[in-house]
Amino acid sequence: MSNNGSSPLVLWYNQLGMNDVDRVGGKNASLGEMITNLSGMGVSVPNGFATTADAFNQFLDQSGVNQRIYALLDETDIDDVSALAKAGAQIRQWIIDTPFQSELENAIRDAYDLLSADDAEASFAVRSSATAEDMPDASFAGQQETFLNVQGFDAVLVAVKHVFASLFNDRAISYRVHQGYDHRGVALSAGVQRMVRSDLASSGVMFSIDTESGFDQVVFITSAWGLGEMVVQGAVNPDEFYVHKPTLAAGRPAIVRRTMGSKKIRMVYAPTQEHGKQVRIEDVPQEQRDIFSLSNEEVQELAKQAVQIEKHYGRPMDIEWAKDGHTGKLFIVQARPETVRSRGQVMERYTLHAQGQIIAEGRAIGHRIGAGPVKVIHDISEMNRIEPGDVLVTDMTDPDWEPIMKKASAIVTNRGGRTCHAAIIARELGIPAVVGCGDATDRIQENQNVTVSCAEGDTGYVYAELLDFSVKSSSVGDMPDLPLKVMMNVGNPDRAFDFACLPNEGVGLARLEFIINRMIGVHPRALLEFDDQEPGLQNEIRELMKGYDSPREFYVGRLTEGIATLGAAFYPKRVIVRLSDFKSNEYANLVGGERYEPEEENPMLGFRGAGRYVSESFRDCFALECEAMKRVRNDMGLTNVEVMVPFVRTVAQAKAVVEELERQGLKRGENGLKIIMMCEIPSNALLAEQFLEYFDGFSIGSNDMTQLALGLDRDSGVVSELFDERNDAVKALLSMAIRAAKKQGKYVGICGQGPSDHEDFAAWLMEEGIDSLSLNPDTVVQTWLGLAELKK
């Protein structure tokens, strides 16, 4: 296995570590590092061997092909797509036509014989590992080849030759030039690894960090049926899971969010060993598309392995995993540094100032917005049609397209998930991308002007016109001390990890309405009485609740995930979750809701808040919210989550709702539970001391308080100019509430819009002695710094 005592041509993974990157590249060095150091810590990596950089360089040198390669590259204009394609094809053919020296062929044969000794029909993965690949400043993102289900020595030898040639793929040549790498300084190592039979199970990619926000307290896992190449390439829309690291470390259920992907196709073994045809793609049966491709226990097991790998490397990691269909065992097949977040973070906020017609939606990559004319590209041969500033719309953006991706103002694809190669490249280039839209190439027209927004959460939108947007950059260090806490209003769990990276002291208002509306979408009564619904409605609900065991579990489970995401994002800081405050017309708009909601002239003043919770017609629906709260606090241990009750009209209602919460297992003081009341009706301030007997504090809702104090409909344009939280009557009521809470030593904050809109109002509240301001995320830094200036 060595070259007559000189530098080895082949090395086993258990002989390798991260100090061998220059010999076997980042990918193979990392596999060796894990086998050597993490095998005893629950991290399983299939065995294998690697050809060395010396083997590659000797192969090029002794054959003389290297001189032809570098001469051709030196005279080729890399930015000329056609010239690049012609040169790349010529170089790859030269390498494939060049025979291996006998020493290298024999070294590979010896290693292969040992690796396959226990199973003559074993199959192997043959992967590339470039000596500059997977360094923290160079995300080569699959620019070299991988060959799967390679059986027999001759097939392995052919695959190694093609791996060597792949160092000169068009995308790899282009990438090296634009990243400043010298072609002569990069070599290739081929890794030969025993295959995990994930063609019979599932596989995917995971990150030990949230890829979009850089939030480092979660593991993000993607999964689909079959071999992992489909997820990596972006050919399928995979299942997604978020696992909260502190909850996992505490030994509790730690999955805070699950999203089911369509998983329409999978890659499996093919019956032939003809090179390049050892795998095939097939449709996934509908019954498998409609279930998650990993169990909750498997998700948590993978997350534990990710945490161990991250801990060992001391940095966020990008990890490929596979489940063996024969044994059910989970394996790690690759691990590399996560590249994008390591580059440092400038706080950059993109804001869309208008809404337009949505023509496509999918998974948002990044948080930026791009706009421009559309180019619908159906085939790589059309690459030269892309001009700088175009929006690239295609079925899936293979990494071969990297030379043109950097020209685009945005990228939109039919297929792909947030861990595919295209998503990684888009993040690295700082280009917004919306992937997995399904039918974008049909719905978006050539040369149509569109706006692509990734600034609205996990879902990215393509709008049918050029919309106004802005970007605000700021550099934030340590924030100055204030006599109050600056908290945040958050409704969309999709944005929670992003917002948690802003300066904050917790969440003063987490709304359930977004979760119920967008993540569930069905009236709770329609789920509780599912069997009584008409067949058409039942089918609509079944489509929404895929992956959940029952209609009730769908509601409670989705609500639990939404609340847990908010609680985990800001853990261990305080997160005050307001129970649902839909009005009857809003509940009626949910699927199945019209049947159960009254027609009201003014729903704003009707059947809402605490009165709804204790009514006979809604009590068992309210129990579902309480069940979700209990799971988050008691099962998952996210006791930083507190409960807030909205729209409590009378003291008797206050007493009744607290008793109902206790009946549902949410007893004030038990397991540290605090119950806060929204102070948003004049009666709440006028009788503040009586209301506070039943609660642990107030959160002032200045929006409702203003409209009720001044007799305004805040949704009416006719009287909107009179709506002002700074009105003396409103301020008098707020002062009463603040003083009453202070007198009893209880918490008092504000979560209404006022302090976000009016810095002078925020300053007045600070002088009044309020404990916290809960602001819109986009005003947190500005208001915080502004108040600090006033205190000087």
Predicted feature residues:
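Acidic, glycine-rich flexible loop/linker segments
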Residues: 66, 338-343, 347, 360-364, ...
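Conserved catalytic alpha/beta cores of large enzymes that bind or transform nucleotide phosphates
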Residues: 218-318, 323-324, 363-370, 388, ...
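Small/polar (Gly/Ser/Thr/Ala-rich) solvent-exposed segments
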Residues: 214, 450, 704
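Conserved alpha/beta-domain cores
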Residues: 112, 119-125, 130-140, 144-148, ...
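Alpha-helix C-terminal capping segments
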Residues: 34-37, 210-213, 407, 423-431, ...
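N-terminal beta-alpha lobe that positions the nucleotide/phosphoryl donor
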Residues: 1-191, 200, 286-297, 302, ...
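Conserved metal-phosphate-binding beta-hairpin within the catalytic cores
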Residues: 142, 314-339
